[in-house]
From Swiss-Prot:
This is Arginine decarboxylase. PROSITE patterns: OKR_DC_1. It catalyses: L-arginine + H(+) = agmatine + CO2. Keywords: Cytoplasm, Decarboxylase, Lyase, Polyamine biosynthesis, Putrescine biosynthesis, Pyridoxal phosphate, Spermidine biosynthesis. The keyword Hydrolase does not apply. It is an enzyme of class 4 (lyase). Disulfide bonds: none annotated. Its cofactor is pyridoxal 5'-phosphate.
Amino acid sequence: MSQHETPLYTGLKKHASRQPVQFHIPGHKKGAGMDPEFRQFIGENALSIDLINIEPLDDLHAPKGIIKQAQDLAAEAFGADHTFFSVQGTSGAIMTMVMAVCGPGDKIIIPRNVHKSIMTAIVFSGAVPIFIHPEIDNELGISHGITLESAKRALTEHPDAKGLLVINPTYFGVAADLKSIVELAHSFDVPVLVDEAHGVHIHFHDELPLSAMQAGADIAATSVHKLGGSLTQSSILNMREGLVSKDRVQSILSMLTTTSTSYLLLASLDVARKRLATEGRQLAEETLKLANQTRDRLNQIEGIYCVGSEILGSKAAYSYDPTKLIISVKSLGLTGHDVEKWLRESFNIEVELSDLYNILCIFTPGDSQNDADRLVEALTEIAQQMSEQDVTHQQTEVLLPEIPLLAMTPRDAFYANTEVIPLKEASGRIIAEFVMVYPPGIPIFIPGEIITEENISYIFKNLDAGLPVQGPEDSTLHMIRVIKEQKAIQ
């Protein structure tokens, strides 16, 4: 088949055009049985293909027809041996690849700045995480990837590891030397798993970091919806045969996937793949041009710093994605969250994320020159407002806490006997739940780590700044769940 074809999307439209009488779910029956206002808003075309896995439309859990054809075309487009569609988001795809290689007690080497879905998979599987400290950018206050040297030390100390997981690229667009890391891991017969949630587009332009499949990785969870043009919650899992079992991946993915798979999501993956495969390079070229022009303009604004190629050069920053605009605002004396709120309220602009020091803006083929102009105008205005204030402000100091020590496996901690105590009194105790700022969803604490005063202070610093700290059962974070201490019987 040609990359210009869309077997799944075309098959759905053909089926809908026959207007069959539906005595099956979904109960809205092409919109006829739902609220009229919502039906009008969504549109009849979309509702006509909101279908289920009846025989003519194939089954994601055992694809043999139009879904298999669409997945095969995706594998060809991404240079994979096999591609699996996911309607459980990239989180579902990530959990699948971890659980496909790890069982209870198995070691997996991972950077500590992983997404919560990876740690969730480790809890589910019972795997033992071997953490690599990611390289820290103390100027920006963000984590990069892992270095070749740290990966080599981890593999040398733990040659029995069942997998090495790499983030490529990071949320902020920075990539390590993935090809060399893959070659190193393969010399130990260890498969490389890649969290490629923020890199679906990098496969299609040579000025972007190498994709997981280009670097020779064994399996990669790739988020098409984030930057590739499909609908939210749709993703793919690319893999190469050899160190990872295709049948095992299919089995685990099926276990984690709803039986009511959304054909709207699946169709959007099919058409997004077609556009990436046939127009991806040109689309990336135009996006890179707009992003780079915007970066140059932002760097003319006093107090604003938009990161460019100067971020490269460290061992963990081998290449980067210029379509991610990391905008440091600490010289304004404001937090990233302050600026995010101001952009929303004053210019109706929404950013991808903010932290204590930065905002992150993502450019895709969906952005226009007018959008870029508005961002530049807005940041020019807030910088001018800050410079005109009579009060002197100090540049925000970047503070990043040490990574906590892991005292027990995340699974053991998650299922242990626990109690709830005030967070302010929890220093020295072993935490039994996740604490993270979302986005990006990178844990401050994971179950099994020892709570420190430094990390408690960091949590309150994020809360005081208005950032979304999530994870604990107590959403106010006044209380935290910890492992119950076993006291001797008197």
